[in-house]
Amino acid sequence: SALPARSEMCIRDRHCFSSPLKVAEEALERGYVLSFAGNVTFKRNAELRQAAAKAPAGQLLVETDAPYMTPEPYRGQRNEPALIGHTYECIARVRHQTVQALAAEVNDTFDRVYGLR
């Protein structure tokens, strides 16, 4: 398994998640938070979008991974925080949410996971 066996990890955030759907399902079952970057927007990453769609509220984050993982339609260029809206739009679409609802959900998850509340 690609997941650490130790269940006492403090922060269970799978940064820049890019593993197969089966790993996503196992990680979610174990209580991990999956963090998605611009690679979720790549045409060939339908399985990654499925993982984002399956992540329940409270187990999903969105990140830039700048200067890497630039979202479509800017793939191949240097990534920067200003482009994160494309990643949010892609994930919101597959989750059947508005971008605003997804952003609020991600904000709540971030605050909880990183102890800001």
Labelled PLM ranges:
Residues 7-8, 26-37, 54-59:
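Glycine-enriched alpha-helix->loop->beta-strand junction motifs that scaffold or abut catalytic
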Residues 12-18, 36-40:
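Catalytic beta/alpha-barrel core
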Residues 27, 65, 102:
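Conserved, mostly hydrophobic/aromatic
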Residues 82-117:
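Mid-to-C-terminal alpha-helical segments outside catalytic/metal-binding sites
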